Curated annotation (Swiss-Prot):
Composition bias type Pro residues, residue spans: 221-237
Name of this protein: Histone deacetylase 9
Catalysed conversion reaction: N(6)-acetyl-L-lysyl-[histone] + H2O = L-lysyl-[histone] + acetate
Functional summary from the UniProt entry: Devoided of intrinsic deacetylase activity, promotes the deacetylation of lysine residues on the N-terminal part of the core histones (H2A, H2B, H3 and H4) by recruiting other histone deacetylases. Histone deacetylation gives a tag for epigenetic repression and plays an important role in transcriptional regulation, cell cycle progression and developmental events. Represses MEF2-dependent transcription.
The organism's taxonomic lineage, starting at the top: Eukaryota, Metazoa, Chordata, Craniata, Vertebrata
Compositional bias segments (type: Basic and acidic residues): 132-153, 160-172, 522-536, 567-585
Segments of skewed composition (Low complexity): 293-312
Organ and tissue specificity: Broadly expressed.
Enzyme Commission identifier(s): 3.5.1.98
GO molecular function: histone deacetylase activity, hydrolytic mechanism
Region annotation (Disordered) ranges: 132-172, 214-258, 293-313, 522-596
An annotated GO cellular component: nucleus
Protein location: Nucleus
Secreted keyword on record: no
Length: 596
């Protein structure tokens, strides 16, 4: 419609009246459109008269009035423009309405989306809270269960302690009464004890203390080993005379006895030496008491005021004849037999091989002494003066060497190499005897074959303070190669050679028997050849036996060579040669009988 208006304006400018007429005709044709728009005009425009654009009315308008037509056309143009503006406003209003509706819908959708997201977040948070609460509840339950278990364990472990506390809180009056009785009995029995044992107890109060301590400890539990205790038993009339502990609660006694048993079980290993050290200490104390009693009997005038007479008497007795020494040795042997019989028998069963680990490091040196002293019996066969020398040596060194070697030497096996060891031991002890007789004391140079705990009697009397435990190696490595180890290795090698020789002889005899059986099957023409073969074999055996004998003599000379003055002659093994000749003669006789 706007296009028609623009066309009409351009047409008016070119053709004045003709264009106007055509325009009016067109406007009449569109009269129907104007009627429709008229209802949409505002109220202020209703006063304007509607245009009559119909073409039928063209004849009714006078043609000669151009001014009126122009006015009418201008009015129509204005109306058209107004209509266009109104339409624009309507379109804009509709657009705005639609835009507002769309924005509202979009906002509603956004709000709904936000609400959904918020609800989802809230659900997630609730789930997380629920999970956390569950975890906290589970942790609390676990803690409660652990606490209950701990309480149950404590209740199971500590009912005895509560009972002990209750029992300990009771015995106060009984303790006081027993202490008073003990003090009274001690004060009453102190005078006769001091009068009877003034000689030994006065100089050695430590022995009395150890005896009392052992009685207090060993009343509740029996001694762990079969040895006799180190204290003297009280007289039967004084049964109430016993030392008490600080607390007289009964469970404490049980605990101490159990602890003692545990310690004994733990220290049953041969590497540990506490169990043996108790026995050895008691044995040393008894030897010391016997020595004192012998000194006091030899010099009855001497008492507590003259303690230096003991070592002088002992040194004087070293130079006395052998008969006085033998009586003392017998006393010591009988006394030691009661204490160390079981231990000596157990030590005899040990295998002392230098190739094996040193298991007996924690024990005393009695094992080596048992090995060396077992040769006294054989020495009595070869040398009748050896037992006398051994007895005199033992008497002169009775304070340092334990008497178990004298007791076990009566049951030793015969062995030539052990005789060599005994001779070396006697020589070393004679050297130390000369040093003692001259007035010196051997401190640095001691024989490796002698005992480790050797102490002179004078030093034993003068040494009152307790000694430290001797240090020992803690490794299980074999001992260094000493003279004992070398001799043992040589002895084993010689035994191996003898066994090999016997095996070869047995093989040779089997061959001879097989040949004899074959010759019996063959004709009699080969008998002379068989006899010659047998004669040649006998000659070969005699030569081999002579060679072996010369080798054995050379080996003994080599063994005794490094020791210098020590040489032991070994007799040739005649028994084996006699057995060989006897077997050969029997074979010849059997062969001759079969031939005939």
């Amino acid at each position: 419609m706007l296009q028609t208006i623009y066309e009409s304006e351009s047409y008016f400018s070119s053709d004045g009246v003709a264009g106007r007429e055509q325009l009016l005709a067109e406007q009449r044709m569109h009269a129907m459109i104007g009627k429709d728009i008229k209802s949409e005009f505002p109220i202020g425009l209703e006063s304007i008269s509607p245009l009559d654009l119909r073409t039928d009315l063209r004849t009714a308008v006078p043609v000669g009035d151009p001014g009126l037509r122009e006015k009418q056309l201008q009015q129509e143009l204005l109306i058209i423009k107004q209509q266009q503006q109104i339409q624009k406003q309507l379109l804009i209003a509709e657009f705005q309405k639609q835009h507002e509706n769309l924005t509202r819908q979009h906002q509603v959708q956004l709000q709904e989306h936000l609400k959904l997201q918020q609800e989802l977040l809230a659900m997630k948070q609730q789930q997380e809270l629920l999970e956390r609460e569950k975890e906290q509840k589970m942790e609390q339950q676990r803690k409660e269960q652990e606490a209950e278990r701990h309480r149950q364990e404590q209740q199971l472990c500590h009912p005895r302690s509560k009972d002990r506390v209750k029992e300990r809180a009771v015995a106060s009056t009984e303790v006081k009464q027993k202490l008073q009785e003990f003090i009274l009995s001690k004060s009453a029995t102190k005078e006769p004890l001091t009068n009877g044992t003034s000689h030994s107890m006065g100089r050695h109060p430590k022995l009395w203390y150890t005896a009392a301590h052992h009685t207090s400890l060993d009343q509740s539990s029996p001694p762990p080993s079969g040895t006799s205790p180190t204290y003297k038993c009280p007289p039967p009339g004084n049964q109430d005379d016993f030392p008490l502990r600080k607390t007289a609660s009964e469970p404490n006694l049980k605990v101490r006895s159990r602890l003692k048993q545990k310690v004994v079980e733990r220290r049953s290993s041969p590497l540990l030496r506490r169990k043996d050290s108790i026995v050895s200490s008691s044995y040393k104390k008894r030897i010391f008491e016997v020595a004192e009693s012998s000194v006091s009997s030899s010099s009855p005038v001497s008492g507590p005021s003259s303690p230096n007479n003991g070592p002088v008497a002992m040194e004087a007795e070293h130079e006395t004849p052998v008969l006085s020494v033998n009586s003392r040795i017998e006393n010591l042997v009988s006394h030691h037999h009661l204490v160390h019989h079981e231990r000596s028998l157990s030590l005899l069963n040990l295998y002392t091989s230098p190739s094996l680990p040193n298991i007996t490091l924690g024990l005393h040196a009695t094992a080596t002494q048992l090995n060396t002293s077992s040769s006294l019996k054989e020495q009595q066969k070869y040398d009748p003066q050896a037992p006398r020398q051994g007895v005199s040596m033992a008497g002169q060194y009775a304070g340092g060497i334990p008497t178990s070697s004298n007791h076990v030497s009566l049951e030793g096996k015969a062995n030539s190499h052990q005789a060599i060891l005994q001779h070396l031991l006697l020589k070393e002890q004679m050297r130390q005897q000369k040093i003692l007789a001259s007035g010196g004391t051997p401190v640095l140079h001691q024989s490796p074959l002698a005992a480790k705990d050797r102490v002179s009697p004078a030093g034993r009397v003068a040494h009152k303070l307790p000694r430290h435990r001797p240090l020992h190696r803690t490794q299980s490595a074999p001992l260094p190669q000493s003279t004992l180890a070398q001799l043992v290795i040589q002895q084993q090698h010689q035994q191996f050679l003898e066994k090999q020789k016997q095996y070869q002889q047995q093989i040779h005899m089997n061959k001879i028997l097989s040949k004899s059986i074959e010759q019996l099957r063959q004709p009699e023409g080969h008998l002379e050849e068989a006899e010659e073969d047998l004669h040649g074999d006998n000659l070969m055996q005699e030569k081999s036996s002579s060679i072996d004998n010369t080798r054995s003599y050379s080996s003994t000379d080599l063994r005794t060579g490094p020791f210098g003055s020590v040489k032991v002659k070994e007799e040739p093994p005649d028994s084996e040669n006699e057995i060989k000749t006897h077997l050969q003669s029997e074979q010849k006789s059997v062969f001759a009988q079969q031939v005939t």
